Amino acid sequence: MIYGIGIDIVEINRIKKIVIRSGDKLAKRILRKSELKLYYSKEYPVRFLSKRFAAKEAVLKAFGTGMSQGITFSQFEIFNDDLGRPMLRFFSQAAVLAKKLDLVRTHVSVSDTGLYACSIVIFEC
């Protein structure tokens, strides 16, 4: 059964302006250490950050709570499996909520063009 669906789209140029203005502050705020390591290794880090930002916003929307239940961007990470598919891993309060909701599967899809990054997340119980 589908519990929640979240979708988000972000202008890559908006994220680029934030990075130009404040350096890696945004990256450090929303990415976990493993994601931050990837961010620093990318040829196009702003594009990577834009996609992660859209995906993390979509996760919060799929939970249906936003940040109101104490869930923050750093309490979950998006990683790629051996086939390159984006996957989710929960920590802290996000893990507690995922367990409480009895989530059995999560689906993440991320895409980008020259102008936009978008993501959709589906939670199944």
Curated annotation (Swiss-Prot):
Q: Where located? A: Cytoplasm
The gene name reads acpS
**Reaction equation(s) it catalyzes:** apo-[ACP] + CoA = holo-[ACP] + adenosine 3',5'-bisphosphate + H(+)
Keyword check for Transmembrane, yes or no: no
- State the needed cofactors, names only: Mg(2+)
What is one cellular component GO term in this UniProt entry? cytoplasm
One biological process GO term for this chain? Answer: fatty acid biosynthetic process
Q: Which GO terms describe its molecular function?
A: holo-[acyl-carrier-protein] synthase activity; magnesium ion binding
Q: What is its EC number?
A: 2.7.8.7
Q: Which organism is it from?
A: Blochmanniella floridana
Residues annotated to bind Mg(2+): 8, 57
Which keywords belong to this entry?
Cytoplasm, Fatty acid biosynthesis, Fatty acid metabolism, Lipid biosynthesis, Lipid metabolism, Magnesium, Metal-binding, Transferase
Domain of life of the organism encoding this protein = Bacteria
Q: Give the family from UniProt.
A: Belongs to the P-Pant transferase superfamily. AcpS family.
Know the name of this protein? Answer: Holo-[acyl-carrier-protein] synthase
